[in-house]
Amino acid sequence: MAKEIIFADDARNRLYSGVKKLNDAVKVTMGPRGRNVLIQKSFGAPSITKDGVSVAKEIELKDTIENMGAGLVREVASKTNDEAGDGTTTATVLAHAIFKEGLRNITAGANPIEVKRGMDKFVEAVTSELKSAAKKVDGKKEIAQVATISANSDSSIGDLIAEAMEKVGKDGVITVEEAKSINDELNVVEGMQFDRGYLSPYFITNAEKMQVELSSPFILLFDKKITNLKDLLPVLEQIQKTGKPLLIVAEDIEGEALATLVVNKLRGVLNISAVKAPGFGDRRKAMLEDIAILTGGEVISEELGRTLESASLQDLGQADRVVIDKDNTTIVNGAGDKDSIEARINQIKAQIAETTSDYDKEKLQERLAKLSGGVAVIKVGAATETEMKEKKDRVDDALNATKAAVEEGIVVGGGAALIKAGNRVNLSLKGDELIGAEIVKRALFAPLRQIAENAGFDAGVVANSVSCADCPNYGFNAASGEYVDMFEAGIIDPVKVERIALQNAVSVASLLLTTEATVSEIKEDKPAMPPMPDMGGMGGMGGMM
C-alpha cells in the first residue's frame, strides 16, 4: 500500500491538530465543576463519564497523521492511569500545553534537541521540589479528603474509602463491585478468606445460614488429592482424642475418603469439614504455605518427603474460628507466630517490587492482604446501569489516588502544586535549553487554568493570584470560587499522581517536538457498492409454466 510522507513543520502541525482534538474532549472533565462526556458504544446504551482516560481511550480520528498524535497522548493518559491510577486529565492537558508552547518556539527556529534537554532538566528539578513539599498522610480525615477530590468532590465516596482503608490497613486489598441496590455498601472480611467452599453440604453446622462454623479447630494442610481413607486414619484418631473440630484443606478429597468423613460427621464421631486448596499450580503451593504460616501449621507435602500417614497434631495449624459457606472459607485469628507472619509479608512485598507482570502483582497483593489485615469490598449503588458505571469509575480513581497519597504523600491540590514547584526552581541554563525550561514552566499553569475555566472563572486572573511566591499553601477553590489555604480546605493531591502526570506528559511532548517526518498509509476511498439491478418483471414468471 502507498505511504504518505510529511516533513518538518507540516508533520508537527498535523500531529498537533490531533493532540488538540483529543485534549479538547478530555479537558472539559477537569476539576470539581468539570462536565460530563457522552460516549457512543458499538452496542448497548451510551456511557457517560468524567474520567479522562475513559474519554481518551474512545477517541480515534479519521486523519491518520492526526490520529498518530492523538494516539501518543492517549498513551500518556493510559500510562499515567496504570502507574498512578489517577491524573490522566492532568497528564493530557500538560502534554498539549507543552507541545503547543514548544511548537511555537521550534517553528521560530529553536533547536528541538536542545529544547528537549532543557525540558528534561527542568522536570527533574520540579519533581524534586514536589517531593520536598510533600506532606505525609496521617489519619482518616486526610485519606477522605484525597479520595473526595479524586471522586469529583463526592464526599460520600471519600468517607467510604477512608473507612475501608482504616479497617484493612494500607497493605489491605480494597475491591470495587456493583451493588444490587441504589445504596453504597462497605463489607470487610476479617482474617484470611479464600474462594473455596465446603466439599459436601452434609458438613453444614448452621442450617439457617447454610454455613460450617468451627470453633478452635485443628487445620490439616495437604498438597495432593486424598482418595484413600487409610492414609487419614492415624491423624483422625489423634483428633478424636482431643475432641476438637478439624478442617482439611487439600487439592481434593473424593471417593471413599469423602464418603467416610461425611458418615463420621453425621454420626457425631468427628466434627469435621473439608475444602479444596485455593489457587492452581505453584500459586496453590504458595497459598497453602501462607495458610500454614498464618495458623502455625505445616503443609504435608510428598515433595518434602512427608506422607499423610506421618502427620501428627504438631503438624496441624490452629485458629480461633473457621467459617465456610458454599463459595468461601474464612480463617479468623490463626495461631501462627507473629515473627514468621511478618517475615512472610516482607517476602511477598519483595516479590511485588520485583515482578513486572500486572497479573502476578495483583495476585501477590491479594496474598499480602490476606496475611496482613483483610479485604474490604466497596459495593457501588446507583439508580441506573449508566450511572453505576460512571460512579464505579470515580470510585476506582479515588481508590488509586488514595493509595498513591499514602505511598508518597500529598501536596496542595487544584493545580497549584505544579505552579509553586516550578516557581521555586532556579536553574542556570542558556540558549535553547533555557527556552525548553521556560516552555514547561509556562505549561505548568495549564491544569489550574483549565480547572478555573471549567468552573466559569477568568483563568488568567486565577493563575496570577495563585502564582504568589511567599504563600506555599495558597490556592483556588473552584467549587466555591474562593482563594483558600488548600490544606485547611482539604483540597490536596497525591505527589505520585502529580509527578507521574508531569513526567509522562513531558516525555511524549518532547517526542512530538523532535519529530521531523511522519510516514502513514494513504487511505483509499473504496468505491460505493453498485446498486442492485432492477428486478422488475420477475412477478410475471408464473407465465413460464
UniProtKB/Swiss-Prot annotation:
Superkingdom to which the source organism belongs: Bacteria
GO molecular function: ATP binding; ATP-dependent protein folding chaperone; isomerase activity; unfolded protein binding
Recorded catalytic activity of this chain's protein: ATP + H2O + a folded polypeptide = ADP + phosphate + an unfolded polypeptide
Enzyme Commission number(s) from the entry: 5.6.1.7
Entry's Gene Ontology BP terms: protein refolding
Family, similarity comment: Belongs to the chaperonin (HSP60) family.
Binding partners and assembly: Forms a cylinder of 14 subunits composed of two heptameric rings stacked back-to-back. Interacts with the co-chaperonin GroES.
Function: Together with its co-chaperonin GroES, plays an essential role in assisting protein folding. The GroEL-GroES system forms a nano-cage that allows encapsulation of the non-native substrate proteins and provides a physical environment optimized to promote and accelerate protein folding.
Protein name (Swiss-Prot/TrEMBL): Chaperonin GroEL
Species assigned in the record: Campylobacter fetus subsp. fetus (strain 82-40)
Gene name, Swiss-Prot/TrEMBL: groEL
